[in-house]
Amino acid sequence: MQKEQNVRLVLASASPRRRELLSQIGLEFTVMPSTKEENAKTTEAGALVQELSRQKAVDIWEQLSGGQGQNPDADQEQIAEETQEPNLNGKRQPELLVIGADTVVCCEGKILGKPHSREAAAEMLTALQGRSHEVYTGVTLYSQSETVTFFECTQVEFYPMTEVEISEYIDSKEPMDKAGAYGIQGLGARFVKGIRGDYNNVVGLPVGRLYQELKSRGWM
């Protein structure tokens, strides 16, 4: 049985894989991708994905809320209640909650984002083949009443790949819009030797952890 949502969810991402994962666990949401330029000072993977996910969530929340920034010194619970306008039935509208997410691959300390060229994709896959790497996804849940930011890390091991296999995989175009230049849920699965941690985290969103965070705060 599907649990009732107590918030209006907005996904600040254009990723079709994240949309599929949210739908898979029965959440109702709308999509409004953030186009904010990514800008983070840290190069540590866990901190990086958390910061970028927060930037995306804040960007969309401010657009939808009319640019009213969150006041960290205010009584956020009171603000949330006061800003929920009643609908025609006299009931309070659900609180707006924006989900921001960002994923990177980290191989031997080097962060790999999405490849911007065929050459970059080949370089990434060459670095990943035959060894283990980590996939980090940061998630931010941003509302007027509370901000929650966390990340999950999953270890993935690849089989050795030949230059021909790498070239043919890039020909499929699958690597070009994915962190680390591969999709574990697609053709890239043929190169995966093992995984330790949350599979969905590698796809782009640790929905198990996400659901627990929503539930523990009364948003579900």
Could you say what each language-model-derived stretch is?
Residues T30-E38:
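A short beta-strand-loop structural module common to alpha/beta enzyme folds
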Residues A40-T42, G46:
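N-terminal beta-loop-helix "entrance" segment that forms/cooperates
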Residues K3-V10, V31, G46-M220:
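Anionic-ligand binding patches
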